[in-house]
UniProtKB/Swiss-Prot annotation:
EC number: 3.4.21.88
Organism (species): Verrucomicrobium spinosum (strain ATCC 43997 / DSM 4136 / JCM 18804 / IFAM 1439)
InterPro entries recorded: LexA, LexA-like, LexA/Signal_pep-like_sf, LexA_DNA-bd_dom, LexA_repressor, Peptidase_S24_LexA, Peptidase_S24_S26A/B/C, WH-like_DNA-bd_sf
Subunit structure: Homodimer.
GO molecular function, one term: DNA binding
Name of the protein in question: LexA repressor
Amino acid sequence: MLTERQQELLDFLRVYQRQQGVMPSTRDIQLHFGFASQTAAMSHLKALERKGVIRRLAGKARAVVFPEVMERETVDIPIFGLIPAGFTADNPEHSDGNLTLDLRTMGLSPRSKPFALKVRGDSMTGAHIIQGDYVILEQRDPRPKDIVAALMDGETTLKRYLVDNGQPFLRAENPSYPDLIPARELMIQGVMVGLFRPYNGR
């Protein structure tokens, strides 16, 4: 999955090549985005290369090309409306349909067992996650500040995962909601890695 800045850079490369017939230099990229140095521009190009959306040719100026054929790894991942207690992504019969995603562009492996959760409520609006969105999650151990789908004391919720003095708790991205401190159990069911927002035509 590309960051907002990486997507802006990729779009700039495409437009520049279409209009100028060549790729921009690192100096062109630096000036366009206001980077402090050409080294910063190169760092962003390397990030795009690591994610497989461009290729750089060694020893050549303006040596950025788009792969003629992108290797795609498109799969259907299950959508869960309300995650049932104890669910796993190995039980697609509990799902509410599927989303078709290219895992390569998101930096995911099928082994991570990605799945989608349809958002309900307004507790995560501060993270720009609104009702009707689909959050894409993978099954792995969370790191502090990750947004997670968690089963806490028998109920499932989407919140930010935090740790204080070794004690994990969950925090909404909306000041109207209190922190959630587990009384008995806290099971992380997935860590958010992306978001899909359906277009409603408005």
